[in-house]
Regions:
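Short helix-capping/linker segments at secondary-structure and domain boundaries
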Residues: 33-37, 79-80, 157-163
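Short, mixed-charge aromatic SLiMs
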Residues: 3-12, 51, 95-98, 138-141, ...
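Non-catalytic, well-ordered alpha-helical scaffold segments
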Residues: 21-25, 65, 69, 145-149, ...
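Charged substrate- and nucleic-acid-binding regions of tRNA-handling and nucleotidyl-transfer enzymes
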Residues: 123, 127-187
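Small-residue-rich helix-loop
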Residues: 37-142
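A conserved active-site cap/scaffold subdomain adjacent to cofactor or substrate pockets
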Residues: 1-52
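Short, hydrophobic/amphipathic alpha-helical patches that form generic packing surfaces
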Residues: 26-30, 69-76, 149-153
Length: 191
């Protein structure tokens, strides 16, 4: 209703009533950030239908619902929301963006060999995952900021993702481990 009042046609052509894309973008951002996750997911499904995108599987929908808590606040529109959540919409094997592959060649993959088995037993919540990853970084004498881009590549195929910890919690233990193993096997064979 508020958008209808702001963008009515009564005074079109007069300065205050001009169609302002910046204002529209702001309204869209506020709407996305303040909409209940289930309602937002329903709107996103409708958007995908309108733009002739394939429908999402139940696994993708469940993952999106879990990830909206930490992704919806930083986007202005549905295309950005989809991009921000692309990690959950990808199926294995994960294709790695070309801009990330050169970082992989410089990365000691032994870090993943140490991390992956330990993920089997850790309590699967953000704080415990953060503790474990920091501990593994200490073991291999690397800073987390050095390891994070490779984890992003393994989990999402990209460097533009939400937090590694948030992605891991949304993907779940099994999917996270499978993605890390596939990544390690692929790049151990290529390097």
């Amino acid at each position: 209703e508020q958008a209808k009042n702001w963008f009515n046609l009564k005074h079109i052509g007069k300065s205050p009533s001009r169609f302002d894309f910046k204002k529209l973008s702001n309204i869209s951002k506020l709407h996305i950030a303040n909409t209940d996750n289930a309602a937002l997911l329903h709107e996103l499904i409708e958007y995908l239908n309108v733009v002739d995108q394939p429908s999402l599987s139940q696994n993708h929908l469940n993952g999106l619902l879990r990830s909206l808590d930490f992704t919806k606040s930083s986007v202005k529109n549905f295309p950005e929301l989809i991009e921000k959540n692309s990690f959950i919409l990808k199926d294995r094997p994960i294709n790695i963006d070309p801009d990330v592959t050169e970082k992989i060649e410089e990365f000691p993959l032994k870090t993943l060999k140490i991390l992956t088995p330990q993920l089997q037993n850790v309590k699967w919540d953000r704080s415990k995952l953060e503790e474990l990853l920091n501990s593994v970084c200490e073991q291999v004498e690397l800073k987390f900021r050095t390891v994070a881009p490779i984890l992003r590549a393994a989990l999402a195929g990209s460097s533009k993702t939400p937090s590694v910890f948030d992605m891991m919690t949304v993907l779940g233990r099994e999917e996270t481990i499978e993605r890390l193993i596939e990544f390690e096997v692929k790049y151990n064979n290529e390097i």
